[in-house]
Design a protein with these regions (language model features):
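Active-site cofactor/cluster-binding pocket
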Residues: 1-204, 208-210
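Thiamine diphosphate
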Residues: 2-67, 71-84, 208, 215-310, ...
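Structural motif
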Residues: 71, 92, 208, 257, ...
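Short beta-strand segments
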Residues: 74, 94-96, 262, 285-289, ...
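Short, conserved loop/helix-junction motifs that constitute active-site signature segments
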Residues: 82-90, 278, 505-510
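A short helix->loop->beta-strand "cap" motif at the edges of active sites that frequently abuts
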Residues: 87-93, 233, 282, 511-512, ...
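Gly-rich Lys/Arg/Thr-decorated short loops/hinges at beta-loop-alpha junctions or inter-strand turns
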Residues: 147, 171-186, 201-206, 224-231, ...
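Flexible, low-complexity linker and terminal segments
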Residues: 190-198, 202, 334, 339-560
Length: 560
C-alpha cells in the first residue's frame, strides 16, 4: 500500500536527539524527491519538557502543516499519552518496548537490543526509513553527511546501528502505507525561514549585523556569523537591544547595509533607535520575529500580534515599510527587497516573521545567488559638487548621501531637527519643510509596494484574507472549501505597510463574504484595512494560543 501525503510526529524530551532525527529524516526525504514541511514545537528549557518535531511529506508541494498524524515516533512514554489521539485511522505508533506501551496500532522497538540509549535516534532513523520505504543507501549517506569529520570510530558505530535497525524493521510485518517512489527527484535544499532571511540579506550585500539574543530571531544572526569571515561581514552580539539598534544605525551611517534581528520584547527597547533612524534618514533593516506576549509570554511559540507595534513604533512621524513573508522563498526575496527599500529611501524598514515561519523548514529550489547583484547602497559616488547638503530639499524627499571620511565634505547626521546641512535648528519654518521632505518619500515607497497576491476564483463567494506565515494554511483551506457551487479566493499581503487600496479594494468589494485570518486577538490587519479604506471584513478567524494556524483550524472556525 502507498500513501502520497502523510505526517510524521517525533516526540520526546529536549536532549534526546529529536532535532537530529528529524533533520536526518527531512534531508533523506528531500534527497528522495519528496516535498516536505517541517514544524517544531519546543519548550523554553535546555533539557526535559516535551518537544515535538513534525514532518509533513508529500509527492506534491506541501504548503501547510496538518493536525492529524500518520506516524508517531515516541522517544518517551509521555509522547504516546499526549499524542495518540492525533493518530489518524491507519496510522502507526513507533515506541520503545521498554516503555510498556499498550495501545492498538503500535510497533514496539527493542531500542536497548538494537543500540545503546544514546543511539536511540539512529535506531529510530533506521526503523522509520524502512516504514516509509526510503532507499536505505540514501539514508545512510544522509547520516554520513551529518557525521562529517567526526571521530571515525563513532561514525562507524552509528552506521552499524543504522544497518541493524534496517534489518530488524525489514523482518517485521507492519500494516503501514509506504510512500510511492518519486520518478525523477530534483535538487532542492532544506531551509527554514531564518536561514532564508540570512541568505537573502547576504545576497543583497549586508555587511553588519548587531543583535541581542532573543528567540525566535537569534538564528538569523547565527547563520550570518557562520558566513562572516567568508563574506566580509561583521556580526556583533551587543550588551542589550538598545546598543544593538544604535550599532546598526552607526554602521549604516558609515556606509554598510545593516540588519538587526529581534523579537517583540527586544524590539520594544529599540523604538527610540527606530525614531533616530527616521530623523537621521539612515537605512536599517529590523527583523521582528514574533512570539506571543505580553512581556516574556510564550517565548518558543508563535503569533502575529506585533503588526501594530511595528507600525507605530518610534515617536514622531516618518516613513517606513513593513514586509511580511508567507513562505521560506519569500523570506529570501523580501530580505533583499527590504534592504533595497531601506537604502533607496533612507530610513527604517521592517521584516515581520514569526516563530512558525522562522523555524519551519521546506524543500526549496536553490536560489540563483551567483547571478544576483548586491543592492545599490544609495550612496552618491560623485562628490565634486559644492556645497554638500545632506538633507537637501528634493521633489522625491530623498537627499544626497555621502559617507564620512570618504570625501572632503563634512558629513553630518543627528537626532535633532536640522536644516539642509544637518546641523541643529529650532527654526519652525525649517521644521515644516523637513517634515514635508521626509514624508514625500512615502510616495516613492508606495510606488514600489509589493501588491497582495490573489489566488482562486474571480468574484468569489468567500475570500480569505491573510498576511505573513498563514499563507499556506489559507491556500490549502481554500482548496478544500472550494466546490462546484462555491467560489473561493485568497488574498495574501506580503507587504502590510504602506497599503495601496487600488491594489486590493476591488477584490474585497467583489467578494460575497470576506474573512480575515490572523494569528492575533484583534485582527490587526483587518483593523488596518478598515482604517485605510473604510472596508470592514465580515468575519475574522483568529488564533492566539501559540500554535500555528492550520487548514483544519480555519475550516472549523468557519463552521464548514
Amino acid at each position: 500500500m502507498e500513501k502520497t501525503d502523510l505526517t510524521l510526529l517525533i516526540g520526546g524530551e529536549a536532549g534526546q536527539g529529536l532535532v537530529t532525527l528529524g533533520q536526518l529524516l527531512a534531508k533523506s526525504l528531500v534527497h528522495a524527491g519528496y516535498s516536505i514541511l517541517v514544524t517544531q514545537s519546543y519548550q523554553s528549557r535546555i533539557r526535559g519538557g516535551h518537544n515535538t518535531f513534525a514532518i509533513r511529506v508529500s509527492t506534491e508541494a506541501v504548503v501547510a502543516p496538518r493536525e492529524s498524524v500518520d506516524l508517531l515516533i515516541a522517544m518517551n512514554a509521555e509522547t504516546v499519552t499526549l499524542h495518540k489521539a492525533e493518530v489518524a485511522d491507519g496510522g502507526l505508533i513507533v515506541a520503545d518496548e521498554a516503555h510498556g506501551t499498550e495501545t492498538d496500532g503500535c510497533l514496539l522497538v527493542p531500542y536497548q537490543q538494537l543500540g545503546e540509549t544514546r543511539f536511540a535516534n539512529v535506531v529510530a532513523l533506521g526503523v522509520v526509513s524502512v516504514l516509509l520505504g526510503l532507499d536505505q543507501p540514501l539514508v545512510a549517506r544522509s547520516l554520513d553527511d551529518f557525521l562529517g569529520k567526526k571521530d571515525h570510530e563513532m561514525a562507524e558505530k552509528n552506521r552499524q546501528i543504522l544497518t541493524t535497525a534496517f534489518d530488524w524493521c525489514d523482518q517485521q510485518t507492519v500494516a503501514f502505507e509506504k510512500l510511492p517512489p518519486v520518478a525523477k527527484p530534483i535538487q532542492r535544499l532544506v531551509m527554514n525561514g531564518n536561514e532564508a532571511i540570512a541568505m537573502g540579506a547576504l545576497s543583497a550585500g549586508v555587511k553588519f549585523c548587531s543583535f541581542y539574543p532573543m528567540t525566535p530571531a537569534t538564528s538569523i544572526a547565527l547563520n550570518l556569523a557562520a558566513q562572516a569571515s567568508r563574506m566580509g561581514l561583521v556580526v556583533e552580539q551587543a550588551e542589550d537591544e538598545i546598543a544593538a539598534i544604535n550599532m546598526a544605525i552607526g554602521a549604516s551611517f558609515a556606509g554598510v547595509p545593516s540588519i538587526v534581528p529581534t523579537s517583540g520584547g527586544g524590539f520594544a527597547l529599540m523604538t527610540e533607535g527606530v525614531s533616530l533612524a527616521g530623523m537621521s534618514e539612515t537605512p536599517v533593516l529590523i527583523v521582528v520575529a514574533q512570539r506571543p506576549g505580553p512581556a516574556t509570554g510564550l517565548p518558543t511559540r508563535t503569533e502575529q500580534a506585533d503588526l501594530e507595534l511595528v507600525l507605530y513604533a518610534g515617536h514622531g512621524e516618518f516613513p517606513r515599510a513593513i514586509f511580511s513573508p508567507g513562505t521560506v522563498e519569500e523570506c529570501f526575496w523580501l530580505a533583499r527587497k527590504s534592504l533595497e527599500v531601506a537604502a533607496k529611501f533612507q530610513g527604517p524598514v521592517f521584516l515581520l516573521t514569526d516563530q512558525f515561519l522562522a523555524d519551519s523548514s521546506r524543500a526549496v529550489t536553490p536560489f540563483d545567488i551567483d547571478n544576483l547583484e548586491p543592492i545599490d547602497p544609495g550612496v552618491e559616488i560623485d562628490a565634486s559638487s559644492l556645497p554638500y547638503r545632506r538633507y537637501a530639499i528634493t521633489p522625491s524627499g530623498v537627499s544626497p548621501r555621502l559617507l564620512p571620511g570618504m570625501t572632503k565634505h563634512l558629513v553630518v547626521a543627528g537626532g535633532d531637527e536640522h536644516p539642509v546641512d544637518g546641523h541643529l535648528t529650532e527654526d519652525l519654518n525649517v521644521r515644516n519643510l523637513m517634515v514635508a521632505k521626509r514624508l514625500r518619500k512615502e510616495q516613492g515607497i508606495m510606488a514600489e509596494v509589493v501588491p497582495p497576491e490573489f489566488q482562486g476564483d474571480e468574484g468569489p463567494d468567500l475570500l480569505l484574507v491573510t498576511w505573513g506565515s498563514s499563507k499556506g494554511s489559507v491556500l490549502e483551506a481554500a482548496a478544500k472549501l472550494r466546490n462546484d457551487s462555491r467560489r473561493v479566493g485568497t488574498l495574501h499581503f506580503s507587504q502590510v505597510w504602506p497599503l495601496v487600496p487600488d491594489q486590493f479594494l476591488g477584490y474585497l468589494e467583489s467578494a460575497g463574504e470576506v474573512v480575515c485570518v490572523e494569528g492575533n486577538v484583534y485582527g490587526q490587519l483587518a483593523r488596518l484595512i478598515r482604517r485605510e479604506t473604510g472596508f470592514g471584513v465580515h468575519r475574522r478567524v483568529l488564533r492566539y494560543d501559540g500554535l500555528p494556524i492550520t487548514p483544519e483550524y480555519i475550516i472549523r472556525e468557519l463552521g464548514d
